[in-house]
């Protein structure tokens, strides 16, 4: 069985999650002796799909995040009668969507709000959602639904949108900081940026405000304090993607669909208190956050670019890379590092050069500044 896969270009190039999911798919496919054909996302419209599928079911995996790109892709595949298994997104209304593998956003939001309630926190914000992200839309929908069920009349006032960049999102939130005792961040990039800014402005985490973020890469462990995470592993999504594809492939019946929702796991770190800790009481005025009409694309934001680079860097480094960098950031020379780690000086040099290339940096000093600025030690 061959599995064709199409990945949204920006998501493929800039998101560690896409690499984690693809890695899990490749591992599962290898264990079952299937094959994978990755479709070029820049030219998928001009591909000969009759030649690709021949006499097999017209079915492919689609990994994407942004609503506008996905809408165009699904409209195209509906027209040419190619069925789709969607990963990480819950988007109905298209005849071509026969399967979905996604996080159970409803259950995960309920779990996080229950955790905050057990901690004594009842004034929770949703932070950093990007309106063009299908997963972020789902998180906001279920957050607002749960808050409305809990008696909040205008839950949209508790949601802070990454409308024109994370800096503006933070400014809107900080102007109302005293209204909240807890925050759910939609992803690790938004959470790390929030934690850094709050710490800079003298807001203590978790004493003044508690933070939990969706996500689960090493990025959330780079800030101080380390962030509590609600994670749905990319390995599980990738594995379920292959199993869902196989089921639909062999069923090969238009009436059959298959939707898999995966509950997240909570990784408790330093940004939340134990349930029996008293929550700090605050009072505040109620007002709507400022709005912006600026057209904004998520990965155009400088802060997002820097955090994405950090995330890719952490994903790309092995334990030996980390050992070299930990010495380097302490101003230990190449000669001393090679002696300590029993490596040749050339090996140290080329590993550092590769890491600079990943981060788009030119000099050792730039690398040290990057590591220091991101609390790498």
Features from the language model and the residues they span:
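Amphipathic helical "hinge" segments at domain boundaries
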Residues: 1-51
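Flexible loop/turn connectors
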Residues: 98, 174-185, 189-190, 195-280
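Periplasmic-binding protein-like
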Residues: 4-6, 56-65, 83-85, 125-128, ...
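An alpha-beta-alpha
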Residues: 110-151, 256-274
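Hydrophobic alpha-helical segments within soluble ligand-binding/sensing domains
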Residues: 99-126, 165-171, 191, 232-250
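Basic, Lys/Arg-enriched C-terminal extension of HTH/homeodomain DNA-binding domains
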Residues: 340, 350-377
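Helix-turn-helix DNA-binding segment
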Residues: 302-347, 372-376
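Flexible loop/hinge segments that line or gate small-molecule binding clefts
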Residues: 67-107, 215-227
